[in-house]
Amino acid sequence: MNKYKEIFGVDISKDVFDVHGSKSGHDQFKNNALGFKSFLKSLPKESLVVMEATGYYHYRLAQFLFKQGVLVSVVNPLSVKRFIQMKLAKVKTDKSDAKAICEYGKINEVPLYTALTDVQSECLQLFRLMDSCLKKRTATKNKIHGEDVLGIPSKYVYRSLKRIKKYLDKEILGIEKKLLSLVKQEQQVQLTLLTSIPGIGIKTALFLIVITDGFDKFENAKQLCSYAGITPTIRESGSSVRGRSRISKVGNRKLRNLLFLCSFTACKHNKGCREVYERIVNKGKSKKLALIAVSNKLIKQSFAIAKSGNPYDEKYVSVLPK
């Protein structure tokens, strides 16, 4: 017999979130403060709300419900995806996803969510703001390049775009400084340890610390690799030996992208990563697959160093479970 009065599966998107109750069935709410309050009113006492870790979208609802005394579980989307595949579900909608998450919560012993600290919450907001500024800066750079290509750019337009880029450069730098200041308040040691790894830059180290709560949210490196979605998938067909390597679309996209960018530097300056890269390429595998493996290696190194408390040492052999 389930220990909760009712289990609710929640599938969250940008504007709405779909809910499936184990007894009450499907419902949908706006993904805003009013929608949160309406959902809260509909919840029976002693209920459990299960949702996927979906980048930034799930944080607000999880935080809100936790602070209202509701039991919440945030689960790995890769685990839910595999659960759906095992059920051989043919129809995929937000409504069906909410139902699948509900069923996953009923069958599995899911971990209970612990609210973020004020520092963690502010850091995530800052990362979201930085992402927005970076996209705007890239768009501005493209416009400047476009004006150059025209050959006779308008001086007013050109200067205006330059001012916008300069402003965004300043904002991004300010956000990075604020993030660094906040993380140093609670995780100075972890930050120093992670940045000792060749290939791991300050931005990636900051993000790793924030989303893992100083590596306390994951029991092993394998769980963190799954969360990032960097376990390579190779498809093989017929007599073909070499399948196409792909990074899973499931997982934390920002972390995955940061690690993939880090892998290029790590291949050159990180002995362990370079050996992994060369071994895979020498077997005739694609360079992309090798870079995915390097990203995976970086997570394992980060996890081992964070847990051991010892800085990077290229001669060190991890004894932590993989």
Give residue ranges: language-model regions.
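Phosphate-backbone recognition surface of nucleic-acid-processing proteins
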Residues: 29, 38, 193, 208-283, ...
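Phosphate- and other anionic-substrate recognition elements at nucleic-acid/protein interfaces
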Residues: 1-155, 268
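Helix-hairpin-helix/helix-loop-helix acidic hairpins
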Residues: 148-203, 212, 270
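Generic structural signal for well-ordered, non-transmembrane alpha-helical segments
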Residues: 131-134, 138, 162, 166-173, ...
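Low-complexity, acidic/Ser/Thr- and charged residue-rich accessory regions of DNA metabolism proteins
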Residues: 239-240, 277-322
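Short, solvent-exposed helix-loop connector elements
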Residues: 112-125, 153, 243-246, 275-292
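A residue-level signal for conserved active-site and pocket-lining positions in enzyme catalytic cores
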Residues: 101, 133, 259, 284, ...
